[in-house]
């Protein structure tokens, strides 16, 4: 059976492309990294090694998932989708090739000798992965339906152009991201107070904009201490906006902003940016307390997630109860108190109004 679906005929604006691609990338990270980590947390609690490896498999599929996400959000057919999957995997710089033979074992215990040059998948980095996947989709969608040779021409052109783009970008972006990660780590050592405050505030801002805080944390491969600061900063937004507006919204809306994403408050912040002050202040205050006083740190895979789907707290609870306790105290309780107090101050000063955080279905 051949693929007959064509690319959409309506013209998309740059804003549409940014929104659609960002949404797809965020969902890819949520499923591959977030659910992958969640499965590993369950596996650790259940002492089930095979399930833990399933979580690992989910995480290393992040590169190809970017391509599928972009193609899906831009309404591509399957020929273009698979081309984007290949291109984004190349762009992620996620596949290594062994220099000698080795024995491999699957999650089910099947063993097989792997010859030299066997591929080894890793998570990779999202910058050039997303770019390569997007290029493949744009090329594929443009060519779809223009010739009688779609079955051959579309995937060949999309894969070739996307993969070459991925190779070129990965050669530049991977070293650059490694350098940026080292720079952030060094700045944290030079001035842990200002460093943790800056990282926490930056990732809190990323979370509340259309950008993906989780993708950016993965992109720069934050060091453990910076990741801890970023996690506190993003968690403060989940907690802060929920406690400030829980009386203004119904249960569903509070669940949406409390454990899915506070990004739903973005339209309200455009109306009155001062609403963001309490959670942002909480992020700046709590991050150095966590990282300096309690030596809180975590992996970059959790850094930008906040309370999304409760992945971070469940992962911390299953791996280190001490860090989980610090996270709950400094990342949840303290930001809630700070945000609520400052919100009442803003109300008293008439800087904000009582119903400006109400979420509406549009």
Model-derived features with residue positions:
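Pore-lining transmembrane helices
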Residues: 2-362
